[in-house]
């Protein structure tokens, strides 16, 4: 089904930098419709439950960071004490909880033709250093994996976007009751 819904979260750095309106306008200009939106101060428990703890998710998150470190010539053992993708994923998840609870976030549901795919394209790659100009992370991110490693934290990359239609469904149900999502 080409018309679908997806979840987008504007992370604390996007909110703190006053980029909410600018980022939202990108999606509206791309033909996506906002069907739910709220600003929340998430608790550590909510973020802990929101991001998966499966070995598959931890490994995937860890591999993304290890790839970024490799591209930047960073030794993961020296910076974070391990090069095991699952353990790196655990470190990322702990840092994500701290980051995502450091300030308010804006959570929204976008609807449109191939919404998941379009949002992912507009957002750009997870790591800002490899996000091309024209993407949200490429145009607005001011962080990088090497700076984040130096400061012992996760990369501030402005937004979270669902990876797949099935993930979007789970994530939308997590943040919104059915009656909060308009058609």
UniProtKB/Swiss-Prot annotation:
What cofactor does this protein call for? Mg(2+)
> Does Transcription count among this protein's keywords?
no
The record ties this protein, via InterPro entries, to: NDK-like_dom, NDK-like_dom_sf, Nucleoside_diP_kinase_AS
Q: Which residues participate in ATP binding?
A: 11, 120, 126, 137, 157
Report which reactions are catalysed by this protein: a 2'-deoxyribonucleoside 5'-diphosphate + ATP = a 2'-deoxyribonucleoside 5'-triphosphate + ADP; a ribonucleoside 5'-diphosphate + ATP = a ribonucleoside 5'-triphosphate + ADP
Tell me the GO BP annotations in alphabetical order: nucleotide metabolic process
Task: Report TM segments.
Answer: none
Kindly report, in one word, the top-level EC class recorded for this enzyme: transferase
Which family is this sequence assigned to?
Belongs to the NDK family.
Output the PANTHER family linked to this UniProt entry: NUCLEOSIDE DIPHOSPHATE KINASE
Q: What does this protein do?
A: Major role in the synthesis of nucleoside triphosphates other than ATP. The ATP gamma phosphate is transferred to the NDP beta phosphate via a ping-pong mechanism, using a phosphorylated active-site intermediate.
Spell out the protein name for this chain: Nucleoside diphosphate kinase
Recorded source organism is: Pyrobaculum aerophilum (strain ATCC 51768 / DSM 7523 / JCM 9630 / CIP 104966 / NBRC 100827 / IM2)
| Gene this protein is translated from | ndk
């Amino acid at each position: 089904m080409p018309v679908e819904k997806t979840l987008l979260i504007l992370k604390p750095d996007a909110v703190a930098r006053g980029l909410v309106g600018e980022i939202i306008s990108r999606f509206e200009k791309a033909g996506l419709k906002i069907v739910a939106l709220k600003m929340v101060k998430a608790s550590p428990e909510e973020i802990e439950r929101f991001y998966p703890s499966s070995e598959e998710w931890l490994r995937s998150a860890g591999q993304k960071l290890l790839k970024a470190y490799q591209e930047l010539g960073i030794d993961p053992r020296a910076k974070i004490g391990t090069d095991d993708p699952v353990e790196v994923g655990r470190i990322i998840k702990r840092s994500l909880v701290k980051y995502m609870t450091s300030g308010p976030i804006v959570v929204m549901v976008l609807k449109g033709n191939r919404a998941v795919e379009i949002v992912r394209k507009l957002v750009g790659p997870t790591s800002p250093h490899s996000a091309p100009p024209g993407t949200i992370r490429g145009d607005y991110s001011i962080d990088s994996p090497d700076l984040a490693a130096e400061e012992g934290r996760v990369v501030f990359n402005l937004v979270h976007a669902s990876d797949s239609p099935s993930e979007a469904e789970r994530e939308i149900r997590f943040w919104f009751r059915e009656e909060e999502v308009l058609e």
